[in-house]
Amino acid sequence: MATPSMMPQWSYMHIAGQDASEYLSPGLVQFARATDTYFTLGNKFRNPTVAPTHDVTTDRSQRLTLRFVPVDREDTTYSYKARFTLAVGDNRVLDMASSYFDIRGVLDRGPSFKPYSGTAYNSLAPKGAPNASQWSDNAKLNTFAQAPYLSDTITAADGIKVGTDTAQAGAAVYANKTYQPEPQVGPSEWNTSIENVKAGGRALKQTTAMQPCYGSYARPTNEHGGQSKDDNIELKFFDSANNAANTAQVVFYTEDVNLEMPDTHLVFKPTVTNGTIASESLLGQQAAPNRANYIAFRDNFIGLMYYNSTGNMGVLAGQASQLNAVVDLQDRNTELSYQLMLDALGDRTRYFSLWNSAVDSYDPDVRVIENHGVEDELPNYCFPLSAVGEIKNYKGIKPDNGGGGGWTADNTVSEANHIGIGNIAAMEINLQANLWRSFLYSNVGLYLPDDLKYTPGNIKLPDNKNTYEYMNGRVTAPGLVDTYVNIGARWSPDVMDNVNPFNHHRNAGLRYRSMLLGNGRFVPFHIQVPQKFFAIRNLLLLPGSYTYEWNFRKDVNMILQSTLGNDLRVDGASVRFDNIALYANFFPMAHNTASTLEAMLRNDTNDQSFNDYLCAANMLYPIPANATSVPISIPSRNWAAFRGWSFTRLKTKETPSLGSGFDPYFVYSGTIPYLDGTFYLNHTFKKVSIMFDSSVSWPGNDRLLTPNEFEIKRSVDGEGYNVAQCNMTKDWFLIQMLSHYNIGYQGFYIPESYKDRMYSFFRNFQPMSRQVVDTTEYKNYKKVTVEFQHNNSGFVGYLGPTMREGQAYPANYPYPLIGQTAVESITQKKFLCDRVMWRIPFSSNFMSMGALTDLGQNMLYANSAHALDMTFEVDPMDEPTLLYVLFEVFDVVRIHQPHRGVIEAVYLRTPFSAGNATT
């Protein structure tokens, strides 16, 4: 192999093929040459990919896909290894690009899986409404219930009458107590009279623990829908409290049921004696729905196959030589490379179910809130079903014909006419404001950092903060993200900026992947998983016999993704692989074409060479909690073929250790930015300085700001260096436009759509600004904390998503920033830029920008090797994070198959490392 020098030797990075003129008809060749200036065929007719038109003689030649079954399996606690023997016959070429692993197994998503918002059970019930219940107080039984079924007869022995038997001369039919009276049956007209009638209903005994009706479920125990546990249904009879005659007017069929709350939990529970399951106080319990938690395989099955982990990789080796062509480096990021490559090839917003390809996303209206208030100019009313006001009974009268202008009773008119006086009774609700407030609480409030939440009183949550039960049970004071917070501004709540926005139930990609598996906890799955490793992903495998094996993870936190990022190991998820097969295609070529291709590729000048799409050395540097400076050093080396830096920031909690087969400290299952590209901490960088040795000034002093230093954002901008109404510097904006789109100092314009990809700068750049009270200039400012702020008092719960309390009273927060009485304010600016990796390009042009030597040469050219020192200044974060830096180099593999069953690989990566599989 050629020795790397100042410029990459592209002469050995190609696949040579027959020129079209060697095998196309002379007429077509002449046509191509004559029309080449305006109708270029390029290499459209390269020999290796020409389809067969003759010599296809056997059924095997025409069989497109072959199924390989493993010759060896190894199923362990943490992984599943499958080994295949690939036998490629004469005059065949196996297309590794078409191969995929076909995996069948069983997935248990665990009890934390909840693929919807809200509840499936009694979702229309008020959150604090109880079920029909009984309890004992002072040795007496109390009942709180509704009796909806109306009849004309109640007997002590048979209960309430539900009909007559026409076959037996109108004999009365009484309720079958196992399911009648049914709770869903009552008067079907609003004007049904309840005077002088008998009524019946069902109620839960005091031995069934009280729960709110919202979210309550009890399984049926008979085909009629009855729910009694044991058919021990007791009839309890009641009469009006002021009726001395003691006649049965109401009967309740009381029972014990298997009462559950499958998808809700309590957010308010009154204080009761320990062990109490039914009491008058418990009627006031309040339920809330469990938080949505979609669980699915990751985008493009990230994490399922082992990459970047020594000892857990795979093998592709010729059986004649046993040389493994798979040589991975610890600092190569195959998964991220595949994500970015797919984005460059197509539209990632289009889902492709075959590879589980549905990219992680978030609702931009949740990340950056445009709080433009609510359009509630007209009031919204609700009316009683009768559409009248308060009704009183009136009798009919008529003028007294006896004269004198008097009145007398009208015996032709009823003595009980139901008449309301004045306007129709109505209640008002501000639908728009309630919908907006509910949106903010469900989408922002519930995702606030845990230190801004609290555990409701009398509710016991587990100590492990990574469990679903803990995350689900914590509640937020709605005032932190209410309709009036930042009203009129386009601003992201500051406390949410460093919270992973992709771990959200509005992550449409995760929701799609979860629904692909279905809506149940237990899933027998059948998936197709592609090979992503760049050296063998697109390989043409020539005739011979090869060993191909790979490891598949079984760690649920790595292979599954959840909305909340809870620890799926603790929360009961599991996966089992029952069968892994390999499907692969032979090129459908004529035999003589295939043999020509084979002969061509056996020639060592026609080796197959592949670039890793990312082409970078990946390095992670720890940033301790609350640290603001990160120095890194690279020892002296030749920087030829170096292309620049990309960098971002990751949370340690969200980054697994890929060097080990199983990371016991990875107790998280949300998105893994390191692997899937869901970066979101770019806004936390302040500046970066770059020094080649101490003597080299790079990139020179002809930029806006200090040499050797790239200022990303500045909070105080006296000179006016910031851009776009935010705190990003013009310098950094230009560098990003230059490195992503080649739009540099020649001006500002929007990049073409084909360049502005999902992971690029311009699409994800979100500048924003707002005004806040100037606490120094506004003399009447008082720092009123959340617990003492009131706005909508009397109409909302106090510091929680609970029943409204309080009285109507003037609000004391926030200070007005508009109108005649606007207070003094200051402007705050910031930006977000998710999914992107900041880039600093390094090229021959940039090398020339350094200080010149006496000989007129740049120091970087004059010396063959230089050490690199970089210092990153970042915003402090209260948890450990990682600086993720890509050193963009050339990462190339050259595959050589000189003989049958022999495969050799040479890896070239300059200027960082090289390796080979030939020795």
Curated annotation (Swiss-Prot):
Is the keyword Acetylation in the record?
yes
The cross-references to InterPro entries, in alphabetical order and at most eight, read: Adenovirus_Pll_hexon_C, Adenovirus_Pll_hexon_N, Adenovirus_Pll_hexon_sub2, Adenovirus_Pll_hexon_sub3, ADV_hexon, VP_dsDNA_II
Q: Pfam families per the record? A: Adeno_hexon (PF01065), Adeno_hexon_C (PF03678)
Name positions with the PTM Phosphotyrosine. 907
Q: What induces it?
A: Expressed in the late phase of the viral replicative cycle.
Q: What other remark does the UniProt record contain for this protein?
A: All late proteins expressed from the major late promoter are produced by alternative splicing and alternative polyadenylation of the same gene giving rise to non-overlapping ORFs. A leader sequence is present in the N-terminus of all these mRNAs and is recognized by the viral shutoff protein to provide expression although conventional translation via ribosome scanning from the cap has been shut off in the host cell.
The job of this chain, per UniProt, is described as:
Major capsid protein that self-associates to form 240 hexon trimers, each in the shape of a hexagon, building most of the pseudo T=25 capsid. Assembled into trimeric units with the help of the chaperone shutoff protein. Transported by pre-protein VI to the nucleus where it associates with other structural proteins to form an empty capsid. Might be involved, through its interaction with host dyneins, in the intracellular microtubule-dependent transport of incoming viral capsid to the nucleus.
Q: Which family does it belong to?
A: Belongs to the adenoviridae hexon protein family.
Q: What is this protein called?
A: Hexon protein
**Protein source organism:** Human adenovirus A serotype 12
Query: What gene name is given for the protein in this entry?
Result: L3
